From Swiss-Prot:
It comes from Hamiltonella defensa subsp. Acyrthosiphon pisum (strain 5AT). GO terms for molecular function: rRNA binding; structural constituent of ribosome; transferase activity. Keywords: Ribonucleoprotein, Ribosomal protein, RNA-binding, rRNA-binding. This is Large ribosomal subunit protein uL2. PANTHER family: LARGE RIBOSOMAL SUBUNIT PROTEIN UL2M, RIBOSOMAL PROTEIN L2.
Length: 274
């Protein structure tokens, strides 16, 4: 994998930095594992904007990813690595010994021809999935479940990982990349290693149009709007003379946004500032 800086042949190419991976499959994806992906434009079923700055973008097929990894005791061969337009990580197409194919998130250093497996007592090596009760303390894992059998929810983006730092009773203690330390049931599954394509963070799109291809619309400052559109709008100059707020008048800059009190007991330490 190489990080390539483009030559400044035009203003749109001057600042572009690409991540080139020669190991990725150059053909079409595995069609039975594709499904339709409908664009919402950030609107809900009533047509109201629920997420700003979303709209347009290139058409995409969604790859059905196996986040549960529940085919225990059946070894799988890595047929190929593929690009996935719906996420920052690359995906790997597995061919199981019973003939079934599934997509998984491609861990770091996984290559075409490698073999992976899932189960209670599989080998401790990158790409294998097993319950966290059987993973050694200090190991680095990704694709972590929050509830047994629900499927992975933590550490799924490119280059992300979680470290197991303790085990007590039915729970293991994890340290997340954000600095948060939380407890999760030891029957939850995780995949050994970290997610590949860590160089994703080094890429530079270089122009506004590249954002639009990805379905991301411009973010307009509140001070550039009219008073009817934003609390910061209007007035002479750029000073809005009040505490920063959202377009709906809710305080920003440090206001707590977490409402899920049900799982507060699972968090041992809040995320720390970097």
């Amino acid at each position: 994998m190489a990080v390539v800086k483009c030559k400044p042949t035009s203003p749109g190419r001057r600042h572009v930095v690409k991540v080139v991976n020669s190991e990725l499959h150059k053909g079409k994806p595995y069609r039975p594992l594709l499904t339709k992906l409908c664009k919402t434009g950030g609107r809900n079923n009533r047509g109201c904007i629920t997420t700003r700055h979303i709209g347009g973008g290139h058409k995409q097929h969604y790859r059905l990813i196996d986040f549960k990894r529940n085919k225990d005791g059946i070894s799988a061969l890595v047929e190929r690595l593929e690009y996935d337009p719906c996420r920052s990580a690359n995906v790997a197409l597995l061919l199981y010994s019973d003939g079934e194919r599934r997509y998984i998130l491609a861990p770091k250093d996984l290559k075409k021809g490698d073999k992976v497996q899932s189960g209670v007592d599989v080998a401790i090596k990158a790409g294998n999935t097993l319950p966290m009760s059987n993973i050694p303390i200090g190991s680095t894992v990704h694709n972590v479940e929050m509830k047994p059998g629900k499927g992975a929810q933590i550490a799924r983006s490119a280059g992300s990982y979680v470290q197991i730092i303790a085990r007590e009773g039915f729970y293991v203690t994890l340290r997340l990349r954000s600095g948060e330390i939380r407890k999760i049931h030891s029957d939850c599954r995780a995949t050994l290693g970290e997610v590949g394509n860590a160089e994703h963070m080094l890429r530079v799109l270089g122009k506004a149009g590249a954002k639009r291809w990805r379905g991301i619309r411009p973010t307009v400052r509140g001070t550039a709007m009219n008073p009817v559109d934003h609390p910061h709008g209007g007035g002479e100059g750029r000073n809005f003379g009040k505490h920063p707020v959202t377009p709906w008048g809710v305080q920003t800059k440090g206001k707590k946004t977490r409402n899920n009190k049900r799982t507060d007991k699972s968090i041992v330490r809040r995320r720390s500032k970097k």
